[in-house]
Amino acid sequence: SIGALTGGIALKNILEKNIQFPKNFGIGFIILFFSLAIGTFVFYFYKEKGNEIKKKSLATFKKEIKEVILKRANFHRYLFSRIFYCATLPAMGLYAVYCQNKFNFNISEVGLFTILNVISMGVFSYASGHLGDKYGHKTSMLLAYLFHFLAVVSALFSKNMFIVYCIFIFIGAGQGAFMPSAMNLIYDFAKDKDKKTYMALIDSFLAPFAILFLLGIGFLVNQGQFILSFYII
């Protein structure tokens, strides 16, 4: 969060300077590249404790997958919930483009959007983790949906830049509430089963829907159908 906050401030300063497009964005991408490279390099030296790997036969693995897909009701409910949550994937760019067209704000505001988004994400990620531990992670997951809904409502009825700032605060809150609850819910309903199998299955099922929402909403935006896109989200 601190790194993203610093990046948001840097981005705002870069975009406020008299640097022509696309050089201004190019500088931002160069900073992003070196930040990712440094992060990857540092992570390379991370040491993990050795785990005893329990080998399974292919037949056993297939049997486990079949059981999860066909018989685990909580897995089904969680998966359907996550499929609909995929609609929020293109939300950040969608809100930014829509609000830019509506209010014609200075492009440097993107840096401030990032700062607000990251602060909100960090605060609500921490808060939802505690809330989930106390009242169940389903509660935190519901908060994630609520905040994304508030972002959509704010966009539809936005009349000034204050509401635009609120949109990105709500997005950050939704993302922050989602991150701890999504993983912890898997641990809750997987119990003593292989969590990696559950996670792999969920990602495999979600991938086509994520692509569908990204392409579908992208197509609607190109047609100028922003309001319809918000209704879908």
Over which residues does each language-model region extend?
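Short amphipathic helix-loop junctions that connect adjacent transmembrane helices
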Residues: G93-V110
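Juxtamembrane helix-start motifs in multi-pass secondary transporters
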Residues: G28, H137-L143, S229
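A membrane-interface helix-boundary motif in multi-pass transporters
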Residues: K12-F34, F219-I233
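Small-residue hotspots at the loop-to-helix junctions and early N-terminal turns
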Residues: I107-G111, I115, A200
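Substrate-agnostic recognition of the 12-TM MFS/MFS-like secondary transporter fold
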Residues: S1-N13, F29-F45, R77, S81-M92, ...
